[in-house]
């Protein structure tokens, strides 16, 4: 009887009660990002981090993915955007690892290096934390985003965001 009541209560929740989730087979949240995903200047290969998507709300029209480095603020005076993809189809389950993140899916935005590609973690010294955040949106943006940090994106698109989820990794 309890399971039946639970199912009824869950079915009464609004569609937006289900929030997008992401994970990576390359590393667990809070752990170290493997070297190959780093920038070529730090011995990496600039291969994009593979991402799994789950629990995308049924009313989502698109997904946006932003990877940034808030620790860069201490070095360059701003949060550094390493990767931004908009208009990822909401039925996408997985983004594969690809050189420079050229996936052929979604719309690549300009990173802080002013290029439309994945730029791997590249701290000049000391360990940095890299945040990868996915947003489910109630619309398609149909444009390339320009070096928007997660905070700026959230401010500009607060009315379009249905849900979000973030994982973090360390890199030295």
Give the predicted meaning of each segment.
Residues 4-16:
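Sec-dependent N-terminal signal peptides
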Residues 18-172:
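N-terminus-centered regions that define maturation/targeting leaders and the start
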């Amino acid at each position: 009887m309890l399971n039946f009541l639970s199912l009824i209560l869950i079915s009464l929740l609004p569609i937006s009660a289900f929030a997008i989730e992401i994970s990576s087979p390359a590393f667990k949240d809070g752990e170290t990002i493997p070297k190959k995903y780093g920038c070529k200047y730090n011995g990496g290969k600039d291969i994009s981090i593979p991402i799994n998507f789950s629990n995308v709300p049924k009313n989502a029209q698109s997904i946006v993915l932003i990877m940034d480095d808030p620790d860069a603020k201490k070095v360059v005076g701003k949060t550094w955007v390493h990767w931004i993809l908009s208009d990822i189809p909401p039925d996408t389950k997985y983004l594969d690892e690809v050189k420079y993140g050229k996936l052929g899916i979604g719309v690549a935005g300009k990173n802080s290096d002013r290029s439309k590609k994945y730029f791997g973690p590249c701290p000049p010294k000391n360990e940095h934390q890299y945040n990868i955040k996915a947003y489910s949106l109630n619309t398609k943006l149909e444009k390339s985003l320009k070096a928007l940090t997660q905070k700026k994106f959230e401010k500009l698109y607060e009315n379009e965001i249905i849900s979000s989820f973030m994982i973090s990794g360390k890199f030295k």
